[in-house]
Amino acid sequence: MTPIFFNQQYPTLVDICARWQLVYDANATFELRFESDTLSLHKRDEPKLDGIVVDFVTGAVAHRRKFGGGRGQSIAKAVGLKQGVMPSVVDGTAGLGRDAFVLASLGCTVTMVERHPVVAALLEDGLRRAYQDAEIGDWMRERMRLFHGSSLEALSKLALEVDVVYLDPMYPHRDKSALVKKEMRVFQSLVGADLDADGLLAPALALATKRVVVKRPDYAEDLDGVKPNTVIETKKNRFDVYVKAAMK
């Protein structure tokens, strides 16, 4: 059970917290609010910080969908997206779902796995609103879903056919931009860095039939010390690609 502060008089919040096994704690560092049909996370000792929400419909995520470079994006190349090839993807470290959304918007079917229940609750709420949206709702319902389990091992028991497993473990950020600082400060204080991230590679390789893609900061070492087959570099990050079989 994960401690969280919330308004116990609000049935919607009570239901969400019960669903994700979040237990009320008057002294919890974090608060969940439900306002304007949106679930948001707040750090109670930093009231000036905006709440964190998952929003697939507006803002930066929507802008990237419309103007982000389509299949030419490095992430699309990394997962093997090309003409006639729409791989099924498991995002094993979904976070706020941004990379998963990019892949879904390009045609992949994406199953998100998120082990922290507060983050999973935010994801589920973002999906709920996206599914109802007139512009993106139809394909979102077809292509993007949240797995109600906290690990790749749990997912593997469903015996899904998965082409690609995508991993973006939380790594201590050096970036000083205001947005990254704000979101990452709240996020990292909630979930912490993925100190056991090296343990993700083996189950990912067991689950994926075609490849595993690991997003890393450019200064980070290889995950679990395993050298990738190929690396796609961007300005600040790189995608390490572990190939098991050709994309068809």
UniProtKB/Swiss-Prot annotation:
Q: Catalytic activity, per the record?
A: guanosine(1516) in 16S rRNA + S-adenosyl-L-methionine = N(2)-methylguanosine(1516) in 16S rRNA + S-adenosyl-L-homocysteine + H(+)
EC numbers: 2.1.1.242
A GO MF annotation of the entry reads: rRNA (guanine-N2-)-methyltransferase activity
Locate the transmembrane regions by residue number.
none
Its top-level enzyme class, in one word, is transferase
A GO CC term attached to the entry: cytoplasm
Q: Which UniProt keywords apply?
A: Cytoplasm, Methyltransferase, rRNA processing, S-adenosyl-L-methionine, Transferase
Indicate which residues the UniProt annotation says bind S-adenosyl-L-methionine. Answer: 98-99, 114-115, 150-151, 168
- UniProt KW Transferase keyword: yes
Q: Does the keyword Acetylation apply?
A: no
Subcellular localization is given as: Cytoplasm
InterPro entries from the xrefs?
Answer: 16SrRNA_methylTrfase_J, SAM-dependent_MTases_sf
Entry function: Specifically methylates the guanosine in position 1516 of 16S rRNA.
Protein family per UniProt: Belongs to the methyltransferase superfamily. RsmJ family.
Name of the protein this chain belongs to: Ribosomal RNA small subunit methyltransferase J
What organism is the protein native to?
Shewanella baltica (strain OS223)
Q: What is the lineage of its organism?
A: Bacteria, Pseudomonadati, Pseudomonadota, Gammaproteobacteria, Alteromonadales
Q: What gene does this protein come from? A: rsmJ
